[in-house]
């Protein structure tokens, strides 16, 4: 839906030379999508001044289970009375008014350029290392599977079979493979890469343009 709007000629004309603040609502993965949104807004001539993500802050595996419960039942409740309530927490929803107030103050003081930095300094935007690690690799894996399914279909393969295979792969990857990979990562890689990781967390938490070359 967001991409459809961003491609609309009337919308692109509307945001040209216009300050824009993006709001995100997701389970926990949003950085790849936001990179696309940033590029589209820049292409439209918009001035991205801020980005506020609202996510499920629960454990990745737990939130996958609770979100599934919410999707299949339509009930945003504690599964079996023991799991956390799925989705964006009531506390974060309540906190949204503070984000709005900060935006108003920034506009009134003509300091909208510092809006995002203020959000970060107040620790209102948090990007867990686990999510950063998973999402960066998930994009590559998705592209591999997308190309595989497309190529198999072009050669007369059964698309439904390969899509179902991908579905089961996702379940195995989420609940079996990722915990093992993350454990290895935090033991052997993370301690020696903290500076680079912090730079990446700052980049994705901010509204910076990726430098090329």
Question: Where do the PLM segments sit?
Answer:
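Helix-loop-strand module that forms the ligand-binding subsite of alpha/beta enzymes
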Residues: 1-48, 52
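Sequence-level detector for tyrosine residue identity
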Residues: 28, 54, 166-169, 185, ...
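Short, well-ordered, mixed-charge alpha-helical segments that flank or form enzyme active sites
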Residues: 28-32, 57-62
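Residue-level signal for alpha-helical context at structural boundaries
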Residues: 38, 55, 114, 194, ...
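A conserved mid-domain beta-alpha-beta active-site/ligand-binding segment of alpha/beta enzyme cores
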Residues: 58-150
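Cytosolic-side membrane-insertion boundary helix
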Residues: 149-159
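A transmembrane-helix-recognition feature enriched in membrane-embedded lipid enzymes
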Residues: 157-197
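Membrane-proximal, acidic/low-complexity disordered segments on the non-cytosolic side
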Residues: 189-213
């Amino acid at each position: 839906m967001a991409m459809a709007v961003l491609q609309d000629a009337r919308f692109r004309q509307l945001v040209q030379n216009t300050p824009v603040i993006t709001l995100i609502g997701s389970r926990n993965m949003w950085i790849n999508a936001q990179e696309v949104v940033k590029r589209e807004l820049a292409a439209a001539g918009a001035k991205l001044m801020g980005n506020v993500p609202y996510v499920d802050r629960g454990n990745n595996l737990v939130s996958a289970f609770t979100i599934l419960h919410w999707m299949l039942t339509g009930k945003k409740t504690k599964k079996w009375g023991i799991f956390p309530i799925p989705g964006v927490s009531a506390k974060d929803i309540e906190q949204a008014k503070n984000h709005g107030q900060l935006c108003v103050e920034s506009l009134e003081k003509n300091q909208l350029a510092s809006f995002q930095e203020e959000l970060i300094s107040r620790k209102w935007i948090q990007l867990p290392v686990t999510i950063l690690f998973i999402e960066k690799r998930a994009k590559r894996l998705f592209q591999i599977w997308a190309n595989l399914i497309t190529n198999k279909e072009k050669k007369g393969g059964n698309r439904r079979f390969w899509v179902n295979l991908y579905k089961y792969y996702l379940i195995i990857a989420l609940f079996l493979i990722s915990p093992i990979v993350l454990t290895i990562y935090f033991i052997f890689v993370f301690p020696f890469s903290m500076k680079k990781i912090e730079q990446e967390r700052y980049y994705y938490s901010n509204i910076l343009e990726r430098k090329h070359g």
